[in-house]
């Protein structure tokens, strides 16, 4: 539950900051503060922070601070694109190397045949590259308000749909001792 909260908490803070705090600058500040709180809580409670969270937070802090200093919202808007491309490369390379990163992230929940992990890595890489393109299209062609709404009401459902579309692969190729 804490992991989920640490992922969506900053997004909710960004949304609230944009609509109730006065725009992208406020939203960015709220998201940075919430991210620091969430990472700190994760570390205090779990005694660790995942590598993906460290990557996400680093990109967030760099793009967020540049946005706040420069007053240019472009930097916070390209943050998702940068993250999606980084994650896409990580999952693609781990599939190519036959050492799927996604296996380490999900193995406690589901156990699959090795070739299924590789397929899932490629699909996840494709998903992240797709999301990078979608983010670029939305922020470059629509208003700040539309982009912020997309981050909350578009990205989450698209991600959920992607996960649902992976269920047939997971269910067909799970090992007998799998939890799902």
From Swiss-Prot:
Key words, A-Z: Cell inner membrane, Cell membrane, Membrane, Transmembrane, Transmembrane helix
Bilayer-spanning residue ranges: 4-24, 25-45, 49-69, 76-96, 118-138, 150-170
Pfam families the UniProt entry points to: IspA
Membrane topology classification: Multi-pass membrane protein
Statement: the UniProt record of this protein carries the keyword Ribonucleoprotein: no
Record keyword Cell inner membrane present: yes
InterPro entries to which the protein is assigned, alphabetical: YciB
Localization in the cell: Cell inner membrane
UniProt GO cellular component terms: plasma membrane
Main location group: membrane
Superkingdom of this protein's organism: Bacteria
Family affiliation: Belongs to the YciB family.
PANTHER family documented for this protein: INNER MEMBRANE-SPANNING PROTEIN YCIB, INTRACELLULAR SEPTATION PROTEIN A-RELATED
Described function: Plays a role in cell envelope biogenesis, maintenance of cell envelope integrity and membrane homeostasis.
HAMAP family attached to this UniProt entry: YciB (MF_00189)
Designated name of the protein: Inner membrane-spanning protein YciB
Organism taxonomic ancestry: Bacteria, Pseudomonadati, Pseudomonadota, Alphaproteobacteria, Rickettsiales
């Amino acid at each position: 539950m804490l992991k989920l909260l640490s992922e969506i908490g900053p997004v909710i803070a960004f949304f609230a900051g944009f609509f109730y705090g006065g725009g992208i600058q406020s939203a960015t500040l709220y998201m940075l503060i919430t991210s620091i709180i969430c990472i700190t809580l994760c570390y205090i409670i779990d005694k660790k922070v995942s590598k993906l969270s460290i990557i996400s937070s680093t990109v967030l802090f760099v793009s967020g601070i540049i946005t706040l200093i420069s007053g240019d919202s472009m930097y916070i808007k390209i943050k998702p694109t940068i993250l999606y491309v980084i994650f896409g490369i990580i999952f693609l390379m781990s599939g190519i190397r036959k050492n799927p990163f996604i296996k380490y992230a999900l193995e406690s929940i589901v156990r699959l045949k090795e070739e299924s992990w590789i397929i899932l890595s490629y699909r996840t890489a494709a998903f992240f590259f797709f999301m990078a393109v979608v983010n670029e299209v939305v922020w470059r062609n629509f208003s700040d308000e539309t982009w912020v709404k997309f981050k909350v009401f578009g990205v989450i459902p698209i991600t959920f749909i992607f996960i649902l579309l992976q269920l047939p692969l997971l269910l067909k190729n799970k090992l007998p001792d799998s939890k799902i």
